[in-house]
Amino acid sequence: MSNSMTKLTELREMSDEQLDATAKEAAETLFRLRFQSQSERLNTPSEIKKNRKTIARVKTIQTERQLAQPQA
């Protein structure tokens, strides 16, 4: 995922596997940014917030999909 802030409509069109990959990639990027922010100055501090929001969006969509499935 090249764009760190993915639109909600784009995320909703993704499969479950793609959502998992997107969340994992955003979490790894967030980890690197946090580590970098402690050791040196970030060029774009807003990237931390964008990655956190992307992770939250993915988790929200995953929860919506789980709740939409019929209980078996």
UniProtKB/Swiss-Prot annotation:
Keywords: Ribonucleoprotein, Ribosomal protein. InterPro entries: Ribosomal_protein_uL29, Ribosomal_uL29, Ribosomal_uL29_sf. It comes from the Bacteria. One of its GO terms (cellular component) is cytosolic large ribosomal subunit. One of its GO terms (biological process) is translation. Signal peptide: none annotated. One of its GO terms (molecular function) is structural constituent of ribosome. CDD domains: Ribosomal_L29_HIP. Belongs to the universal ribosomal protein uL29 family. This is Large ribosomal subunit protein uL29. The lineage of its organism: Bacteria, Pseudomonadati, Planctomycetota, Planctomycetia, Pirellulales.
